[in-house]
Amino acid sequence: MSAALESITATIIDLPTRRPHGLATTTMGSQSLVIVQARSGDGLVGIGEGVTPGGPWWGGESIEGIKLMIDGYLAPAVLKLDNPYPGTAMHAMDRYVAGNPFAKAAVEMALWDLLGKRAGLSIAQLLGGPEHATLPITWALSAEDAPKVADEAVTKLAEGYRGFKFKMGAIDAGPDIARVAAIRQKLPDDVLTVADPNGAWDEHTARLGLHALAESGIAVAEQPVSGWNKDALARLRGSAPIRVLADESAQTVQDMMILARSTSADSVSLKVPKAGGISRAAAMATIAIAGGIDLYGGSTLESSIGAAASAQLFSTWPRLLACELVGPQLLVDDIVVEPIRYRDGRLEVPTGPGLGVDLDQEKVRFYARH
């Protein structure tokens, strides 16, 4: 049988969340995903996932748009290739479509999974080999009222989590910082704490806010100003008493080059979807390491498919500030046969071929949007 690629399909599914997850501009009660399946003539199927954190507010791509882009443009571009690998497929997609990193990442992920299954190797092994069997998880807390969020933080602390991320930006900076400070008081001094306004502050507010966050015991501030304003980020980094973590300011390889040259951040949050795929996220990591910028494994609130892809990449990094792959634990259900495993606040990196997880076709049919 031929190993040539025969089809690429994209299916939208909607999964409810275990509790509302408040972000800077929206509150999630469910998560929508695009499941990609790349089928080859020899019977192998590679799987990928397109996912945005709560809709198009973050990067501009919607779940519906991701599916339309894959069906109408990206899949036809890849299927024209004789034997598409992740790299050659990305080049083909770039020729036909500008931007759209989340859609491209979903297709590329499926091809990495297919390549790993054919070789009998995990994606981490294909990338050079894993450095870590487990990854430390920073638990993502919702941007909701302090008492409710504090109770959740204390519960997760008892489960073994040693890192916590405070979502911010939904209310004015003053009361928001007071809310975070009240929650922080419930946690011991030795846990990692990250505050994320999602670029909601102007530079003046951020300068005052970072000092206030430091006084409350927060160790890291993620993207306090708009992603485009790398100059302000650099100025804040030069004066801030806490570590500055770039996210929206680091969406492309070119962004990463600018950050490394300007030393605009202490750390960078890398995400497979926002980078446009595993290969480009890996390239960004290489640039960050060369520039002395620490790596933080970011999340787009993915299922076990997206979490497995990111974990495969993150496990190859020699040093990792933290990792935020909490998506599977925020979802009521998953769409793989055996979901990603978590133990004592750490994620166990799958060791099987490709992504190391297998799609549950019955659940895909059940949760598929009609």
Placement of each model-derived feature along the sequence:
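Glycine-rich, aromatic-flanked loop segments that form ligand/cofactor-binding clefts
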Residues: 106-142
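Shared catalytic-loop signature of beta/alpha-barrel
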Residues: 211, 217, 228-243, 250-346
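Flexible C-terminal active-site loop/helix
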Residues: 3-8, 13-17, 28-34, 41, ...
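Hydrophobic faces of well-ordered beta-strands that scaffold small-molecule active sites
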Residues: 48, 135-141, 164-166, 193-197, ...
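Metal-dependent enolase-superfamily TIM-barrel catalytic cores that perform enediolate-based chemistry
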Residues: 128-240
